[in-house]
UniProtKB/Swiss-Prot annotation:
Assembly mode: The basal body constitutes a major portion of the flagellar organelle and consists of four rings (L,P,S, and M) mounted on a central rod. The M ring is integral to the inner membrane of the cell and may be connected to the flagellar rod via the S ring. The S (supramembrane ring) lies just distal to the M ring. The L and P rings lie in the outer membrane and the periplasmic space, respectively.
One cellular component (GO) term of this entry: bacterial-type flagellum basal body, MS ring
UniProt KW Membrane keyword: yes
Compartment list: Cell inner membrane; Bacterial flagellum basal body
Name of the featured protein: Flagellar M-ring protein
Keywords from the UniProt entry: Bacterial flagellum, Cell inner membrane, Cell membrane, Membrane, Transmembrane, Transmembrane helix
Gene Ontology biological process: bacterial-type flagellum-dependent cell motility
Regions of compositional bias (Low complexity) in chain numbering: 331-353
Species annotation: Salmonella typhimurium (strain LT2 / SGSC1412 / ATCC 700720)
Length: 560
Protein backbone atom coordinates (compact mmCIF):
# COMPACT_ATOMS: atom_id res chain seq x y z
CA UNK A 1 0.00 0.00 0.00
CA UNK A 2 2.81 2.37 0.88
CA UNK A 3 4.73 1.45 -2.28
CA UNK A 4 1.74 2.32 -4.34
CA UNK A 5 1.36 5.67 -2.61
CA UNK A 6 5.01 6.56 -3.10
CA UNK A 7 4.80 5.70 -6.76
CA UNK A 8 1.72 7.82 -7.17
CA UNK A 9 3.33 10.86 -5.48
CA UNK A 10 6.61 10.64 -7.48
CA UNK A 11 7.25 13.97 -9.36
CA UNK A 12 7.08 14.11 -13.11
CA UNK A 13 10.83 14.88 -13.74
CA UNK A 14 11.73 11.68 -11.92
CA UNK A 15 9.18 9.82 -13.97
CA UNK A 16 10.74 11.19 -17.16
CA UNK A 17 14.19 10.25 -15.89
CA UNK A 18 13.04 6.73 -15.11
CA UNK A 19 11.50 6.47 -18.54
CA UNK A 20 14.76 7.63 -20.12
CA UNK A 21 16.68 5.06 -18.13
CA UNK A 22 14.23 2.37 -19.05
CA UNK A 23 14.54 3.21 -22.77
CA UNK A 24 18.24 3.43 -23.77
CA UNK A 25 17.46 4.81 -27.20
CA UNK A 26 16.39 8.21 -25.91
CA UNK A 27 19.74 9.13 -24.22
CA UNK A 28 21.56 7.94 -27.31
CA UNK A 29 19.43 10.13 -29.55
CA UNK A 30 19.82 13.14 -27.22
CA UNK A 31 23.60 12.72 -26.93
CA UNK A 32 24.00 12.25 -30.67
CA UNK A 33 21.89 15.32 -31.43
CA UNK A 34 23.86 17.42 -28.94
CA UNK A 35 27.16 16.23 -30.40
CA UNK A 36 26.05 16.99 -33.94
CA UNK A 37 24.80 20.42 -32.90
CA UNK A 38 28.06 21.27 -31.14
CA UNK A 39 30.16 20.06 -34.07
CA UNK A 40 28.06 22.05 -36.54
CA UNK A 41 28.33 25.15 -34.35
CA UNK A 42 32.09 24.76 -34.08
CA UNK A 43 32.46 24.29 -37.83
CA UNK A 44 30.36 27.38 -38.51
CA UNK A 45 32.42 29.33 -35.99
CA UNK A 46 35.64 28.14 -37.63
CA UNK A 47 34.34 29.15 -41.05
CA UNK A 48 33.36 32.61 -39.83
CA UNK A 49 35.59 35.05 -41.80
CA UNK A 50 37.93 37.44 -40.07
CA UNK A 51 36.43 40.94 -40.27
CA UNK A 52 38.56 44.03 -40.83
CA UNK A 53 37.67 47.72 -40.85
CA UNK A 54 36.58 48.98 -44.25
CA UNK A 55 35.87 52.62 -43.33
CA UNK A 56 35.62 54.48 -40.05
CA UNK A 57 34.47 57.91 -38.92
CA UNK A 58 31.97 58.18 -41.73
CA UNK A 59 29.16 60.65 -41.93
CA UNK A 60 25.60 59.32 -41.88
CA UNK A 61 25.20 60.06 -45.57
CA UNK A 62 28.37 58.22 -46.59
CA UNK A 63 27.65 55.35 -44.21
CA UNK A 64 24.17 54.83 -45.64
CA UNK A 65 25.45 54.92 -49.21
CA UNK A 66 28.21 52.40 -48.45
CA UNK A 67 25.82 50.04 -46.64
CA UNK A 68 23.44 50.19 -49.60
CA UNK A 69 26.23 49.31 -51.99
CA UNK A 70 27.40 46.42 -49.80
CA UNK A 71 23.87 45.06 -49.61
CA UNK A 72 23.52 45.33 -53.38
CA UNK A 73 26.81 43.44 -53.87
CA UNK A 74 25.77 40.72 -51.36
CA UNK A 75 28.80 41.41 -49.16
CA UNK A 76 28.40 40.57 -45.44
CA UNK A 77 29.21 43.44 -43.11
CA UNK A 78 28.89 44.41 -39.51
CA UNK A 79 29.41 47.46 -37.31
CA UNK A 80 32.23 47.61 -34.81
CA UNK A 81 31.18 48.00 -31.21
CA UNK A 82 31.59 51.52 -29.95
CA UNK A 83 33.29 53.11 -32.95
CA UNK A 84 30.57 52.45 -35.52
CA UNK A 85 33.12 51.50 -38.17
CA UNK A 86 31.98 49.28 -41.03
CA UNK A 87 33.75 45.91 -41.04
CA UNK A 88 33.85 43.40 -43.89
CA UNK A 89 35.70 40.09 -44.45
CA UNK A 90 39.45 40.64 -44.39
CA UNK A 91 40.03 39.12 -47.83
CA UNK A 92 37.68 41.63 -49.49
CA UNK A 93 38.80 44.89 -47.87
CA UNK A 94 41.09 46.15 -50.65
CA UNK A 95 38.77 45.02 -53.44
CA UNK A 96 35.78 46.78 -51.86
CA UNK A 97 37.73 49.98 -51.31
CA UNK A 98 38.66 50.09 -54.99
CA UNK A 99 35.12 49.29 -56.13
CA UNK A 100 33.59 51.88 -53.82
CA UNK A 101 36.19 54.46 -54.83
CA UNK A 102 35.17 53.89 -58.44
CA UNK A 103 31.66 54.93 -57.42
CA UNK A 104 32.94 57.98 -55.55
CA UNK A 105 32.45 56.62 -52.02
CA UNK A 106 33.03 57.81 -49.43
CA UNK A 107 32.56 61.38 -50.49
CA UNK A 108 33.64 62.80 -47.15
CA UNK A 109 32.22 65.79 -45.34
CA UNK A 110 33.47 68.28 -47.92
CA UNK A 111 32.38 68.58 -51.51
CA UNK A 112 34.83 69.01 -54.33
CA UNK A 113 34.68 70.13 -57.92
CA UNK A 114 31.75 67.78 -58.49
CA UNK A 115 29.69 70.63 -57.03
CA UNK A 116 30.24 72.55 -60.27
CA UNK A 117 28.67 69.72 -62.26
CA UNK A 118 25.31 70.43 -60.64
CA UNK A 119 25.07 74.11 -61.50
CA UNK A 120 21.78 75.23 -62.94
CA UNK A 121 21.22 77.44 -65.92
CA UNK A 122 20.93 81.11 -65.05
CA UNK A 123 22.95 80.99 -61.84
CA UNK A 124 24.25 84.34 -60.63
CA UNK A 125 27.90 85.27 -60.69
CA UNK A 126 27.98 85.51 -56.90
CA UNK A 127 26.60 81.98 -56.51
CA UNK A 128 29.04 80.69 -59.08
CA UNK A 129 31.95 82.28 -57.20
CA UNK A 130 30.73 80.85 -53.89
CA UNK A 131 30.39 77.37 -55.39
CA UNK A 132 33.87 77.57 -56.83
CA UNK A 133 35.27 78.63 -53.46
CA UNK A 134 33.44 75.76 -51.71
CA UNK A 135 34.71 73.29 -54.30
CA UNK A 136 38.28 74.55 -53.92
CA UNK A 137 38.06 74.29 -50.13
CA UNK A 138 36.75 70.73 -50.40
CA UNK A 139 39.46 69.64 -52.82
CA UNK A 140 42.18 71.11 -50.60
CA UNK A 141 40.70 69.35 -47.56
CA UNK A 142 40.67 66.02 -49.41
CA UNK A 143 44.27 66.49 -50.48
CA UNK A 144 45.41 67.30 -46.95
CA UNK A 145 43.57 64.23 -45.62
CA UNK A 146 45.78 62.01 -47.77
CA UNK A 147 48.67 62.70 -45.39
CA UNK A 148 49.28 59.84 -42.99
CA UNK A 149 48.94 61.65 -39.63
CA UNK A 150 45.84 63.62 -40.74
CA UNK A 151 42.49 62.10 -39.87
CA UNK A 152 40.32 64.90 -41.26
CA UNK A 153 40.79 68.47 -42.42
CA UNK A 154 38.80 71.62 -43.12
CA UNK A 155 39.89 74.59 -45.18
CA UNK A 156 38.47 78.11 -45.11
CA UNK A 157 39.45 80.63 -47.77
CA UNK A 158 39.00 84.39 -47.49
CA UNK A 159 38.89 85.72 -51.05
CA UNK A 160 38.78 89.54 -51.23
CA UNK A 161 36.95 91.28 -54.01
CA UNK A 162 39.20 92.38 -56.87
CA UNK A 163 39.81 96.10 -57.18
CA UNK A 164 41.11 98.29 -59.95
CA UNK A 165 43.10 100.41 -57.52
CA UNK A 166 46.43 99.12 -56.30
CA UNK A 167 46.03 100.60 -52.85
CA UNK A 168 42.74 98.79 -52.31
CA UNK A 169 43.96 95.37 -53.44
CA UNK A 170 44.21 92.79 -50.67
CA UNK A 171 45.82 89.38 -50.61
CA UNK A 172 43.68 86.31 -49.90
CA UNK A 173 44.17 84.28 -46.74
CA UNK A 174 43.46 80.72 -45.68
CA UNK A 175 42.78 78.89 -42.42
CA UNK A 176 43.31 75.13 -42.16
CA UNK A 177 42.14 72.95 -39.28
CA UNK A 178 43.43 69.38 -39.09
CA UNK A 179 42.36 66.52 -36.84
CA UNK A 180 45.32 64.23 -36.28
CA UNK A 181 45.30 60.51 -35.61
CA UNK A 182 45.78 59.51 -31.96
CA UNK A 183 49.46 59.59 -31.09
CA UNK A 184 50.47 61.17 -34.40
CA UNK A 185 51.87 64.63 -35.13
CA UNK A 186 52.95 66.69 -38.12
CA UNK A 187 56.65 67.40 -38.37
CA UNK A 188 58.04 70.70 -39.60
CA UNK A 189 58.45 69.48 -43.15
CA UNK A 190 54.83 68.32 -43.36
CA UNK A 191 53.57 71.59 -41.89
CA UNK A 192 55.54 73.53 -44.49
CA UNK A 193 54.21 71.21 -47.20
CA UNK A 194 50.59 71.87 -46.18
CA UNK A 195 51.20 75.63 -46.11
CA UNK A 196 52.80 75.70 -49.56
CA UNK A 197 50.16 73.34 -50.92
CA UNK A 198 47.36 75.72 -49.97
CA UNK A 199 49.38 78.73 -51.09
CA UNK A 200 50.05 77.25 -54.52
CA UNK A 201 46.42 76.23 -55.05
CA UNK A 202 45.02 79.75 -54.56
CA UNK A 203 46.09 82.55 -56.87
CA UNK A 204 47.83 85.41 -55.07
CA UNK A 205 47.91 83.66 -51.68
CA UNK A 206 51.32 84.11 -49.99
CA UNK A 207 52.49 81.37 -47.61
CA UNK A 208 52.54 83.85 -44.75
CA UNK A 209 48.75 84.23 -44.97
CA UNK A 210 48.10 80.52 -44.33
CA UNK A 211 47.26 79.52 -40.75
CA UNK A 212 47.38 75.87 -39.69
CA UNK A 213 45.74 74.74 -36.43
CA UNK A 214 45.28 71.24 -34.99
CA UNK A 215 42.24 69.86 -33.16
CA UNK A 216 43.63 71.03 -29.80
CA UNK A 217 43.86 74.64 -30.94
CA UNK A 218 47.64 74.66 -31.21
CA UNK A 219 49.09 76.96 -33.86
CA UNK A 220 51.35 74.90 -36.09
CA UNK A 221 52.57 77.58 -38.50
CA UNK A 222 55.33 80.01 -37.58
CA UNK A 223 56.84 82.98 -39.36
CA UNK A 224 60.32 81.46 -39.70
CA UNK A 225 59.33 78.35 -41.61
CA UNK A 226 61.83 79.08 -44.36
CA UNK A 227 64.71 78.95 -41.88
CA UNK A 228 63.52 75.59 -40.54
CA UNK A 229 63.18 74.20 -44.03
CA UNK A 230 66.70 75.36 -44.84
CA UNK A 231 68.03 73.72 -41.68
CA UNK A 232 66.36 70.43 -42.59
CA UNK A 233 67.83 70.57 -46.07
CA UNK A 234 71.26 71.38 -44.67
CA UNK A 235 71.08 68.48 -42.24
CA UNK A 236 70.03 66.08 -44.99
CA UNK A 237 72.81 67.29 -47.27
CA UNK A 238 75.40 66.91 -44.50
CA UNK A 239 74.18 63.37 -43.80
CA UNK A 240 74.43 62.53 -47.49
CA UNK A 241 78.00 63.80 -47.67
CA UNK A 242 79.02 61.85 -44.58
CA UNK A 243 77.31 58.67 -45.79
CA UNK A 244 78.94 58.93 -49.20
CA UNK A 245 82.43 59.26 -47.73
CA UNK A 246 81.72 56.47 -45.25
CA UNK A 247 80.66 54.11 -48.04
CA UNK A 248 83.81 54.96 -50.00
CA UNK A 249 86.05 54.10 -47.07
CA UNK A 250 84.29 50.83 -46.25
CA UNK A 251 84.14 49.84 -49.92
CA UNK A 252 87.89 50.25 -50.44
CA UNK A 253 88.87 48.52 -47.18
CA UNK A 254 86.39 45.62 -47.23
CA UNK A 255 88.30 43.61 -49.90
CA UNK A 256 91.42 43.83 -47.73
CA UNK A 257 90.09 43.09 -44.23
CA UNK A 258 86.85 41.33 -45.22
CA UNK A 259 83.19 42.29 -45.11
CA UNK A 260 82.02 43.37 -41.69
CA UNK A 261 85.58 43.82 -40.39
CA UNK A 262 85.73 47.58 -40.89
CA UNK A 263 83.53 50.40 -39.64
CA UNK A 264 83.94 54.08 -40.41
CA UNK A 265 82.32 57.23 -39.10
CA UNK A 266 82.61 60.61 -40.80
CA UNK A 267 81.86 64.06 -39.43
CA UNK A 268 81.73 66.82 -42.03
CA UNK A 269 81.69 70.53 -41.30
CA UNK A 270 80.07 72.30 -44.22
CA UNK A 271 79.79 75.96 -45.12
CA UNK A 272 76.21 76.84 -46.02
CA UNK A 273 76.77 80.60 -46.25
CA UNK A 274 75.71 82.28 -49.49
CA UNK A 275 78.75 84.18 -50.75
CA UNK A 276 79.12 86.28 -53.89
CA UNK A 277 82.23 88.23 -54.91
CA UNK A 278 82.66 90.86 -57.61
CA UNK A 279 86.14 92.06 -58.71
CA UNK A 280 87.04 94.81 -61.19
CA UNK A 281 90.66 95.12 -62.42
CA UNK A 282 92.31 97.80 -64.58
CA UNK A 283 95.63 97.18 -66.29
CA UNK A 284 97.75 99.77 -68.24
CA UNK A 285 98.35 99.59 -71.99
CA UNK A 286 101.82 98.18 -71.76
CA UNK A 287 101.82 96.58 -75.21
CA UNK A 288 101.47 99.07 -78.07
CA UNK A 289 100.61 96.36 -80.57
CA UNK A 290 97.57 95.29 -78.52
CA UNK A 291 96.34 98.79 -77.76
CA UNK A 292 92.93 99.67 -79.12
CA UNK A 293 92.33 103.20 -80.39
CA UNK A 294 88.94 104.51 -79.45
CA UNK A 295 89.03 108.00 -81.08
CA UNK A 296 91.51 110.51 -82.54
CA UNK A 297 91.06 114.27 -83.02
CA UNK A 298 93.41 116.47 -85.07
CA UNK A 299 93.23 120.30 -85.07
CA UNK A 300 95.54 122.35 -87.36
CA UNK A 301 95.43 126.16 -87.40
CA UNK A 302 97.54 128.33 -89.69
CA UNK A 303 97.96 132.12 -89.54
CA UNK A 304 99.28 134.16 -92.49
CA UNK A 305 100.48 137.76 -92.07
CA UNK A 306 103.18 140.02 -90.77
CA UNK A 307 104.32 139.29 -87.36
CA UNK A 308 106.88 140.04 -84.90
CA UNK A 309 109.82 137.76 -84.44
CA UNK A 310 109.35 135.38 -81.58
CA UNK A 311 110.87 132.42 -79.98
CA UNK A 312 113.96 131.71 -78.02
CA UNK A 313 117.00 133.13 -79.60
CA UNK A 314 119.52 130.60 -80.69
CA UNK A 315 119.70 127.41 -82.68
CA UNK A 316 117.05 125.56 -80.62
CA UNK A 317 114.17 127.61 -81.91
CA UNK A 318 115.22 126.99 -85.47
CA UNK A 319 114.83 123.16 -85.10
CA UNK A 320 111.55 121.39 -86.05
CA UNK A 321 109.21 120.11 -83.36
CA UNK A 322 109.45 116.36 -82.38
CA UNK A 323 106.79 113.97 -83.76
CA UNK A 324 103.76 113.05 -81.64
CA UNK A 325 103.76 109.62 -79.87
CA UNK A 326 100.95 107.58 -78.33
CA UNK A 327 101.14 107.42 -74.53
CA UNK A 328 101.38 103.66 -74.50
CA UNK A 329 105.05 103.32 -73.86
CA UNK A 330 104.71 104.60 -70.32
CA UNK A 331 101.88 103.47 -68.05
CA UNK A 332 99.35 106.18 -67.32
CA UNK A 333 98.60 107.14 -63.80
CA UNK A 334 95.52 105.82 -61.99
CA UNK A 335 93.91 109.20 -62.19
CA UNK A 336 94.36 109.29 -65.92
CA UNK A 337 92.92 105.76 -66.31
CA UNK A 338 89.94 106.59 -64.18
CA UNK A 339 89.12 109.85 -65.90
CA UNK A 340 90.25 108.69 -69.35
CA UNK A 341 92.01 112.02 -69.91
CA UNK A 342 92.94 112.50 -73.56
CA UNK A 343 96.57 113.08 -74.49
CA UNK A 344 97.24 116.29 -76.38
CA UNK A 345 100.17 116.99 -78.61
CA UNK A 346 100.78 120.56 -79.70
CA UNK A 347 103.33 121.75 -82.18
CA UNK A 348 104.02 125.28 -83.17
CA UNK A 349 105.98 126.09 -86.20
CA UNK A 350 106.76 129.72 -86.14
CA UNK A 351 109.34 131.44 -88.14
CA UNK A 352 110.45 134.61 -86.62
CA UNK A 353 111.60 135.69 -89.98
CA UNK A 354 108.28 135.14 -91.78
CA UNK A 355 104.71 136.34 -91.44
CA UNK A 356 103.26 132.76 -91.34
CA UNK A 357 102.41 130.60 -88.20
CA UNK A 358 100.91 127.07 -87.95
CA UNK A 359 99.44 125.36 -84.84
CA UNK A 360 98.68 121.57 -84.76
CA UNK A 361 96.66 119.85 -81.94
CA UNK A 362 96.15 116.04 -82.02
CA UNK A 363 94.16 114.08 -79.40
CA UNK A 364 94.12 110.20 -79.29
CA UNK A 365 91.87 108.20 -76.90
CA UNK A 366 92.72 104.53 -76.20
CA UNK A 367 90.53 101.80 -74.61
CA UNK A 368 91.38 100.94 -71.02
CA UNK A 369 92.06 97.23 -70.24
CA UNK A 370 89.27 96.45 -67.73
CA UNK A 371 88.34 93.07 -66.19
CA UNK A 372 85.15 92.42 -64.15
CA UNK A 373 84.84 89.04 -62.38
CA UNK A 374 81.68 87.97 -60.51
CA UNK A 375 82.09 84.81 -58.44
CA UNK A 376 79.28 82.97 -56.63
CA UNK A 377 80.59 80.58 -54.03
CA UNK A 378 79.15 77.08 -53.77
CA UNK A 379 76.81 76.43 -50.86
CA UNK A 380 77.77 73.42 -48.79
CA UNK A 381 81.51 73.38 -49.38
CA UNK A 382 83.45 71.11 -47.06
CA UNK A 383 85.35 73.09 -44.45
CA UNK A 384 86.72 70.19 -42.43
CA UNK A 385 86.47 66.39 -42.25
CA UNK A 386 86.94 64.18 -39.20
CA UNK A 387 87.13 60.45 -39.91
CA UNK A 388 87.39 57.55 -37.47
CA UNK A 389 88.02 54.01 -38.74
CA UNK A 390 88.02 50.80 -36.69
CA UNK A 391 89.52 47.66 -38.25
CA UNK A 392 88.98 44.22 -36.79
CA UNK A 393 91.74 41.76 -35.99
CA UNK A 394 92.34 39.14 -38.63
CA UNK A 395 91.38 35.60 -37.70
CA UNK A 396 93.87 32.75 -38.02
CA UNK A 397 93.06 29.22 -39.17
CA UNK A 398 92.68 28.04 -35.58
CA UNK A 399 90.21 30.86 -34.86
CA UNK A 400 92.56 33.02 -32.79
CA UNK A 401 92.56 36.80 -33.49
CA UNK A 402 95.80 38.44 -34.59
CA UNK A 403 96.38 42.22 -34.76
CA UNK A 404 97.50 43.81 -38.00
CA UNK A 405 101.12 44.79 -38.54
CA UNK A 406 102.36 48.36 -38.70
CA UNK A 407 102.83 48.15 -42.46
CA UNK A 408 99.29 46.93 -42.92
CA UNK A 409 97.95 49.73 -40.73
CA UNK A 410 100.00 52.26 -42.71
CA UNK A 411 98.57 50.90 -45.94
CA UNK A 412 95.01 51.09 -44.58
CA UNK A 413 95.59 54.66 -43.40
CA UNK A 414 96.94 55.73 -46.80
CA UNK A 415 93.97 54.18 -48.59
CA UNK A 416 91.59 55.91 -46.19
CA UNK A 417 93.25 59.28 -46.84
CA UNK A 418 92.81 58.86 -50.57
CA UNK A 419 89.20 57.68 -50.25
CA UNK A 420 88.14 60.57 -48.02
CA UNK A 421 90.07 63.24 -49.93
CA UNK A 422 92.28 64.20 -47.01
CA UNK A 423 93.45 67.83 -47.06
CA UNK A 424 95.94 69.39 -44.65
CA UNK A 425 94.85 72.83 -45.79
CA UNK A 426 91.34 72.21 -44.48
CA UNK A 427 92.66 70.75 -41.25
CA UNK A 428 91.19 67.26 -41.77
CA UNK A 429 91.82 64.61 -39.13
CA UNK A 430 92.01 60.83 -39.46
CA UNK A 431 92.22 58.18 -36.77
CA UNK A 432 92.57 54.47 -37.66
CA UNK A 433 92.36 51.93 -34.83
CA UNK A 434 92.94 48.17 -34.96
CA UNK A 435 90.79 46.45 -32.33
CA UNK A 436 88.93 43.12 -32.01
CA UNK A 437 85.19 43.27 -32.64
CA UNK A 438 82.65 41.90 -30.21
CA UNK A 439 80.20 39.29 -31.43
CA UNK A 440 77.01 40.98 -32.53
CA UNK A 441 73.70 39.24 -33.10
CA UNK A 442 72.65 40.47 -36.53
CA UNK A 443 69.24 38.83 -36.26
CA UNK A 444 68.02 41.25 -33.60
CA UNK A 445 66.51 43.62 -36.12
CA UNK A 446 64.07 41.05 -37.48
CA UNK A 447 61.53 39.25 -35.35
CA UNK A 448 61.56 35.45 -35.29
CA UNK A 449 58.99 33.85 -37.53
CA UNK A 450 56.94 32.67 -34.55
CA UNK A 451 56.56 36.30 -33.41
CA UNK A 452 55.53 37.68 -36.78
CA UNK A 453 51.91 38.66 -37.25
CA UNK A 454 51.40 36.53 -40.36
CA UNK A 455 52.49 33.38 -38.52
CA UNK A 456 50.24 34.26 -35.57
CA UNK A 457 47.24 34.69 -37.90
CA UNK A 458 47.89 31.34 -39.54
CA UNK A 459 48.30 29.72 -36.14
CA UNK A 460 44.98 31.14 -34.96
CA UNK A 461 43.23 29.91 -38.11
CA UNK A 462 44.68 26.43 -37.61
CA UNK A 463 43.81 26.56 -33.92
CA UNK A 464 40.14 27.01 -34.74
CA UNK A 465 39.99 23.79 -36.71
CA UNK A 466 42.09 22.01 -34.11
CA UNK A 467 39.65 23.12 -31.42
CA UNK A 468 36.76 21.80 -33.51
CA UNK A 469 38.49 18.43 -33.86
CA UNK A 470 39.29 18.26 -30.14
CA UNK A 471 35.70 19.07 -29.15
CA UNK A 472 34.36 16.53 -31.64
CA UNK A 473 36.76 13.87 -30.32
CA UNK A 474 35.77 14.60 -26.71
CA UNK A 475 32.08 14.37 -27.57
CA UNK A 476 32.68 11.10 -29.41
CA UNK A 477 34.75 9.66 -26.57
CA UNK A 478 32.62 10.83 -23.65
CA UNK A 479 29.08 10.91 -25.04
CA UNK A 480 28.56 9.12 -28.32
CA UNK A 481 30.94 6.19 -27.97
CA UNK A 482 29.66 5.00 -24.53
CA UNK A 483 26.09 5.10 -25.78
CA UNK A 484 27.01 3.20 -28.92
CA UNK A 485 28.99 0.64 -26.89
CA UNK A 486 26.10 0.23 -24.49
CA UNK A 487 23.71 -0.08 -27.35
CA UNK A 488 25.88 -2.70 -29.05
CA UNK A 489 26.27 -4.65 -25.82
CA UNK A 490 22.53 -4.54 -25.18
CA UNK A 491 21.85 -5.62 -28.74
CA UNK A 492 24.37 -8.43 -28.40
CA UNK A 493 22.86 -9.57 -25.10
CA UNK A 494 19.39 -9.43 -26.58
CA UNK A 495 20.61 -11.39 -29.55
CA UNK A 496 22.16 -14.00 -27.29
CA UNK A 497 18.95 -14.23 -25.27
CA UNK A 498 16.95 -14.56 -28.45
CA UNK A 499 19.28 -17.27 -29.69
CA UNK A 500 18.99 -19.21 -26.42
CA UNK A 501 15.23 -18.77 -26.49
CA UNK A 502 15.14 -19.93 -30.07
CA UNK A 503 17.28 -22.97 -29.29
CA UNK A 504 15.02 -23.85 -26.35
CA UNK A 505 11.95 -23.43 -28.44
CA UNK A 506 13.46 -25.55 -31.19
CA UNK A 507 14.29 -28.31 -28.69
CA UNK A 508 10.77 -28.18 -27.33
CA UNK A 509 9.41 -28.19 -30.83
CA UNK A 510 11.56 -31.23 -31.67
CA UNK A 511 10.21 -33.16 -28.71
CA UNK A 512 6.69 -32.08 -29.45
CA UNK A 513 6.97 -32.75 -33.15
CA UNK A 514 7.40 -36.53 -32.72
CA UNK A 515 4.18 -36.94 -30.74
CA UNK A 516 2.38 -34.57 -33.02
CA UNK A 517 3.56 -36.46 -36.08
CA UNK A 518 2.37 -39.78 -34.62
CA UNK A 519 -0.95 -38.28 -33.69
CA UNK A 520 -1.17 -36.61 -37.06
CA UNK A 521 -0.37 -39.89 -38.80
CA UNK A 522 -3.02 -41.67 -36.83
CA UNK A 523 -5.50 -38.93 -37.46
CA UNK A 524 -4.65 -39.01 -41.13
CA UNK A 525 -5.08 -42.79 -41.13
CA UNK A 526 -8.43 -42.51 -39.43
CA UNK A 527 -9.43 -39.77 -41.78
CA UNK A 528 -8.28 -41.85 -44.74
CA UNK A 529 -10.24 -44.91 -43.58
CA UNK A 530 -13.32 -42.81 -43.09
CA UNK A 531 -12.89 -41.25 -46.52
CA UNK A 532 -12.39 -44.65 -48.13
CA UNK A 533 -15.40 -46.12 -46.40
CA UNK A 534 -17.47 -43.16 -47.47
CA UNK A 535 -16.34 -43.52 -51.07
CA UNK A 536 -17.08 -47.28 -50.97
CA UNK A 537 -20.55 -46.58 -49.71
CA UNK A 538 -21.10 -44.08 -52.47
CA UNK A 539 -19.79 -46.50 -55.09
CA UNK A 540 -21.94 -49.34 -53.74
CA UNK A 541 -24.96 -47.16 -53.87
CA UNK A 542 -24.20 -45.86 -57.32
CA UNK A 543 -22.70 -48.94 -59.02
CA UNK A 544 -23.26 -52.17 -57.09
CA UNK A 545 -21.78 -54.26 -59.90
CA UNK A 546 -18.38 -52.77 -59.59
CA UNK A 547 -18.43 -53.33 -55.86
CA UNK A 548 -19.48 -56.93 -56.41
CA UNK A 549 -16.67 -57.47 -58.92
CA UNK A 550 -14.13 -55.99 -56.49
CA UNK A 551 -15.31 -58.18 -53.65
CA UNK A 552 -15.30 -61.22 -55.94
CA UNK A 553 -11.72 -60.35 -56.98
CA UNK A 554 -10.61 -60.04 -53.38
CA UNK A 555 -12.17 -63.37 -52.58
CA UNK A 556 -10.48 -65.07 -55.52
CA UNK A 557 -7.14 -63.67 -54.46
CA UNK A 558 -7.64 -65.04 -50.96
CA UNK A 559 -8.40 -68.59 -52.30
CA UNK A 560 -5.29 -68.58 -54.36
Amino acid sequence: MSATASTATQPKPLEWLNRLRANPRIPLIVAGSAAVAIVVAMVLWAKTPDYRTLFSNLSDQDGGAIVAQLTQMNIPYRFANGSGAIEVPADKVHELRLRLAQQGLPKGGAVGFELLDQEKFGISQFSEQVNYQRALEGELARTIETLGPVKSARVHLAMPKPSLFVREQKSPSASVTVTLEPGRALDEGQISAVVHLVSSAVAGLPPGNVTLVDQSGHLLTQSNTSGRDLNDAQLKFANDVESRIQRRIEAILSPIVGNGNVHAQVTAQLDFANKEQTEEHYSPNGDASKATLRSRQLNISEQVGAGYPGGVPGALSNQPAPPNEAPIATPPTNQQNAQNTPQTSTSTNSNSAGPRSTQRNETSNYEVDRTIRHTKMNVGDIERLSVAVVVNYKTLADGKPLPLTADQMKQIEDLTREAMGFSDKRGDTLNVVNSPFSAVDNTGGELPFWQQQSFIDQLLAAGRWLLVLVVAWILWRKAVRPQLTRRVEEAKAAQEQAQVRQETEEAVEVRLSKDEQLQQRRANQRLGAEVMSQRIREMSDNDPRVVALVIRQWMSNDHE
